[in-house]
């Protein structure tokens, strides 16, 4: 079987039936404790619903994920003894994985509250084009833009 086969569907989550939320819960999960991860994510969604009245937390989550996910990134390639940073498009599966990773990282770095509150704050900031995870995406895009002269080295 080839390595580039299709990915297994993780199915929808318990509350919303959304596969992306289910993947996010899996990304948050530590040591196989999925119930704890689901509680954190759903509590974060409840906080979003409470603080942003009239907003659907799932829509805030989707908007935040689209604002965090990078479109291009730089990848290293060695050409004739020199290493170049080559801007390349990011595949959709990697876009989601990077968005989850950055959201998790920068939410954890926030102040000393519960993890659900940290996720809620980072998601709300990301939905409003603010927050550390969006800054990380902008930084990655800036790096790709700065190195677009090496785009002809794409592999």
UniProtKB/Swiss-Prot annotation:
GO terms for molecular function: rRNA binding; structural constituent of ribosome; tRNA binding. Pfam families: Ribosomal_S7. The keyword Hydrolase does not apply. Keywords: Ribonucleoprotein, Ribosomal protein, RNA-binding, rRNA-binding, tRNA-binding. PANTHER family: RIBOSOMAL PROTEIN S7. One of the primary rRNA binding proteins, it binds directly to 16S rRNA where it nucleates assembly of the head domain of the 30S subunit. Is located at the subunit interface close to the decoding center, probably blocks exit of the E-site tRNA. This is Small ribosomal subunit protein uS7. It comes from Chlorobium limicola (strain DSM 245 / NBRC 103803 / 6330).
